[in-house]
Amino acid sequence: MNRYIYLLLICVFLPISGCDDYGIIHIVDQVDEVVIDQTLGLPKTIIGRNGSMMALIPNGIFEMGDHFAEGEQSEQPVHEVELDAFYMDMHEITVGQYRGFIEATGYQSLNWKKILDVSPTDNHPMVHVSWFDTMSYAKWVKKRLPTEAEWEYAARGGLAGKRYAYVGNIHPSKANYNRNIGQTTAVGTYPPNSYELYDIAGNVWEWCLDTYDPNFYSISPRKNPIAEANVFQLAEDFSDDNKPHILR
């Protein structure tokens, strides 16, 4: 998985609240509806006040970083990370959802022509927003951005040591990349990964909570790491002009 300081979009979010002894986030006062997974006995999906479906990402341990030496030096060394369970939006935040935020709060206007040129409908992902724009939206919906570790863990979907977030090679039937469409695609156009997260590869960049530290992988704590050492925020994933190796 690559990380960049190139900025384009709004990201998936996680609810802000405490956790129980199992690391599961308490969300009763922050959602409209809870769907119980009968096997796990835990809320597998939740529906937030902004209408976003959120999937439960189980706690676990994974190897974070570039296993194939195809990315940036800052993606080394590969190291073991342990994360608590959390919920993540199943889709990228849409133009319609962000428009609702602006209308409700009077937040500063954006360059809508530039946005609609590549994301033309309310069901397309929101683009051309800064990290501060995403943080303002997150505060409004009582969520937060995922850390880089949370994002990578969720994006991998439980596929340890694989090149892509899907089984097999990347293909135009699985993701919007390499300008094969010419603009963003509506959220949910392609199949999800095994954690039920859509468009986790391709389509648009996604912001992370961390600040950028090129040496952080060498000093990262094992449990729930977050980099806070610099002024640049992290963006995971890229836009539709990504080459296949960027979608790792």
Label for each model-derived stretch:
Residues 9, 47-50, 55, 74, ...:
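A generic structural signal for short, non-catalytic loop/turn and secondary-structure boundary residues
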Residues 1-4:
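Positively charged n-region of N-terminal signal peptides that target proteins for export
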Residues 20-22:
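Bacterial signal peptide processing site
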Residues 63, 67-69, 108, 114-248:
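Functional-site microenvironments in short loops/helix caps that host divalent-cation chemistry
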Residues 7-15:
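Bacterial N-terminal signal peptides
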Residues 27-47:
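N-terminal low-complexity, Pro/Thr/Ser-rich intrinsically disordered segments
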Residues 37-44, 78, 184-189:
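Short glycine/threonine/proline-enriched tight-turn/helix- or strand-capping micro-motif at secondary-structure
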Residues 46-110, 129-132, 201-202, 209:
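A short glycine-rich, aromatic-capped structural motif
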